[in-house]
Amino acid sequence: MILFSPIGTADPITALGDGPMLHIVRHYRPIVVVLFLSAEIAAFENADRRYSAAITRLAPETDVRIVTYTNPSVHRFDLFVPVFRNHLVELSAEFPDRTILLNTSSGTPAMQAALVAINVFGIPRTTAVQVSTPARALSKPGDRESPDAYDLELMWDANDDNQPGAPNRCFEATSAALGALLERANLKQLIVSYDYSAAVTIAADSRLPDQVSNLIRGAMHRSRLEHLVAPKFFKDTAFTYDPANKVAEYISALALLAKREQWAEFARSATPAITIVLRAAVAKHLPEDRYLDDMGRVDRRKLEREPEIRCALKHPPKSPNAEWYLYTKDWLALLRQFAPDRVGALEVLGRFESRVRNTAAHEIVSISEDRITKDGGLLPEQLLKILARETGADLTLYDRLNDEIIRQIDMAPLG
């Protein structure tokens, strides 16, 4: 037998036992193992040979071959199909009488989806092998060692799969199950891409448990800031949803636009976020009822009794009867007057907002991350960190949510 295996963060051994690749080697004893490594994973192999050394430790006679994939787009399903197929066709020609095993439990969701698709179409003929987790339940982040401080000797000695009688967690996917596997691999790819709307459509027909489907649907509603609908999907989960803290939810959703690289929408959506943060900063030092009405507009009658505030707000509307709303420059002026120690930390927000807003509103150009950084003077990541610091927003929310959704998809029965 020949094993073709992408490598992921559960390989070669976790705190609970064999990772998928090593478990297949343990129970199938292939004569050749081809490890397909992304650039990030290859760096770990180059540093300590953790993947090849684990195979050699278990099965010294195995021929271990390494393929390094340097393209950073490790979440592009369409890129992997021809790459994998070329390697598999070569293996089939080299070993015409051997069964080629595909590890469909390791690597990125896109890698898994590509291997399942190749197996379904049968060119070349392969056998898809799935491996359940050692706990046969949802894995947890703490189950995996940090890849940056990995001790193979320690993990080997603590590996319960080395014990006599340890169960075989491998199973070969049947033709009926392969369609479901491919569908779920595609679903995971949509989740990784933060395309929750498309994921909801696929999940509706994928025979997943309601718990998983509801979490995907909740992610969709939450990312849309649908505060009346979303909270019910996160009841009794680790992903606390407080509808009262709409500002933090907005910042988390803004971070999602950056992850999706929707830079034009990010530029437009940054303005309200910055305004909210500056207004909240002012409110900590200057009660709003001293100068604003219930609608958040400047109350001119109140302002007559507030010379300090009136002095700071130097740009009233030209018409004395016009509604008076405050903008970024006004909130910064109030900060200078009433909280000068806070201006230095927040003034960058004003510069970013005014410059990027002008680009988004007045120029017919493609807005890129580089353009936002050049015009705004801040990387989007830097802007988000400032906004999160001021609001308590969780910038990792949707990544953590994705991890949980994918874990539940992986553990859901195929029938």
UniProtKB/Swiss-Prot annotation:
EC number(s) given by UniProt: 3.1.-.-
Region (HEPN domain): 149-415
InterPro entries: CRISPR-assoc_prot_Csm6, Csm6_CARF, Csm6_HEPN
Consequence of gene disruption: Deletion of the entire CRISPR-Cas locus (cas6 to cas2, Rv2824c to Rv2816c) decreases resistance to plasmids encoding spacer elements about 6-fold.
Renumbered residue ranges of the record's region CARF domain: 1-148
One annotated GO biological process: defense response to virus
Reported regulation of activity: Non-specific ssRNase activity is allosterically activated by cyclic oligoadenylates (cOA), a second messenger produced by Cas10 of the ternary Csm effector complex in the presence of a cognate target RNA.
Keyword Nuclease on entry: yes
UniProt keywords, alphabetically: Antiviral defense, Endonuclease, Hydrolase, Nuclease
Gene Ontology molecular-function annotations: endonuclease activity
Free-text domain note: The N-terminal CRISPR-associated Rossman fold (CARF) probably binds the cOA effector. ssRNase activity resides in the C-terminal HEPN domain.
Extra remark: Encoded in a type III-A CRISPR locus.
Protein family (similarity comment): Belongs to the CRISPR-associated Csm6 family.
Protein name: CRISPR system endoribonuclease Csm6
Gene designation per UniProt: csm6
